[in-house]
Amino acid sequence: MTYEDILGVLGYANGHDVAVRIVTTDRAEVIGIPTSVDTHITAYEVYLRPIGEDETEIALSLGAIELVELV
């Protein structure tokens, strides 16, 4: 998946409060709702709220993402 496609899916999901499934380059999977997508060179990450974990937010490097799909 291209970087532009990854940003497109994450941006859509972030703007519409939709869950995504992310597969990283090391084949780990994360499912959650994006709360922020930061493409600035000093951050370059997406923040996700895992499903059912309203008090938890995790960050993933955009460079570590291989695939994103809407859930």
Task: Map each language-model feature to its residues.
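Conserved RNA-binding domains used in RNP assembly and mRNA/RNA metabolism
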Residues: 1-71
